[in-house]
């Protein structure tokens, strides 16, 4: 199992992104910040990315999936605490 940070920019705010939010719920992602989520999964980053990307319909949308190592050196205030529970 690995923890991934998922970050996105939705470039078309008036578009219906509910399918993306449902996809995040389906993989049991936790909402960390406005457009940042965390997920603990046995799937590789590419699988997570491809699954979510199919729910983003604007070619200008941005999606970033990166491993988050709990032992990594980082600084956060009121955000990363939730990721430690994944």
Predicted regions located by residue number:
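C-terminal structural segments of small proteins and small subunits
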Residues: 54-86
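Long protein-protein interaction modules used by eukaryotic assembly/scaffold proteins
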Residues: 2, 14-17, 85
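Extended, non-catalytic scaffold segments that flank or surround catalytic motifs
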Residues: 31-37, 45, 51
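Short, flexible N-terminal segments of the mature chain
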Residues: 14-36
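Helix N-cap motif at beta-to-alpha junctions
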Residues: 13, 41-45
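Short amphipathic alpha-helices in soluble, non-transmembrane regions
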Residues: 19-25, 48-56
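Short, surface-exposed ligand-recognition loops at beta-strand->loop->(often short) alpha-helix junctions
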Residues: 6-14
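Short aromatic/hydrophobic contact patches that present stacked aromatics
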Residues: 5-7, 36-38
């Amino acid at each position: 199992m690995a923890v991934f940070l998922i970050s996105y920019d939705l470039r078309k705010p008036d578009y219906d992104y509910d399918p993306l939010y449902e996809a995040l719920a389906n993989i049991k992602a936790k909402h960390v910040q406005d457009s940042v989520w965390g997920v603990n999964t046995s799937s590789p980053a590419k699988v997570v990315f491809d699954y979510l990307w199919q729910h983003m319909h604007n070619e200008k949308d941005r999606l970033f999936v990166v491993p988050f190592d709990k032992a990594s050196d980082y600084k956060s205030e009121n955000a990363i605490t939730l990721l430690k529970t994944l």
